[in-house]
Amino acid sequence: MEANQVIRYFPEQNAAYVRIKHMTNDPDDGKELLDFFATLEERGYEHCIIDIRGNTGGNTMHWMAYIVGPNFAEMPRCDFYQLLKGDYAREYAECYGISARPISELPLEELPELCPEDLEGVDSFLVMENGTMKITYGAFEPPLYTGRFWLLTDGLVYSASDSLAADAKASGFATLVGERTGGNGIGYSPVIRCLPNTGICFRYDSGLGLN
């Protein structure tokens, strides 16, 4: 079976590299990352390159628990907004313990590039802490690795991997290098509904995330 993570060391460049193909939240993958960061600190490497190109997502806990949490003594708070339409979306958010606010309270002064079309039909919004929901990082004291992080991205970066990119950019955790991501990382799990007559189930994005 092909490994989900690929690690390389470049001692002459004082840098190391890890490619993460999927956000699995697998304990074995997590241990490999924790050992990797500890090794970088022990060897005094200045740069850590995290390559998430082609990573279409998975579980956000993978990067929270094994990438950001272990390497930030105190994670700065970064608020994002998600726009909602309709009662069902609001009720779905409440299942996650998040209360929607009326759209009239959206701080437009913080969103100067927001397109008016994005607000059409929108009646409420959520404040998403660190891109998803209220996050409790398993912070390490001291952090496992204190060097500089670089995050490689492309257009296939989506969902859970996109939330890492958004969070890393807003918080300053890493310098992003590459292409614009595919999005859909700001928010929570897709809404699931079933048609009343056929019983066919479908899912769709819970809202529109704003970076």
Which residues does each PLM region occupy?
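Flexible, low-complexity junctional segments that flank or bridge functional domains
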Residues: 1-83, 88-101, 148-150, 163, ...
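A structural signal for short secondary-structure junctions
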Residues: 143-144, 169-170, 195-198
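Catalytic-core segments of thiol-dependent peptidases
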Residues: 56-57, 138-140, 155-156
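Cysteine-centered nucleophilic/redox motifs
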Residues: 157-172
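Alpha-helix-centered segments that form part of catalytic cores
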Residues: 106-147
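Catalytic cores of nucleophile-dependent amide-cleaving enzymes
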Residues: 136, 145-160
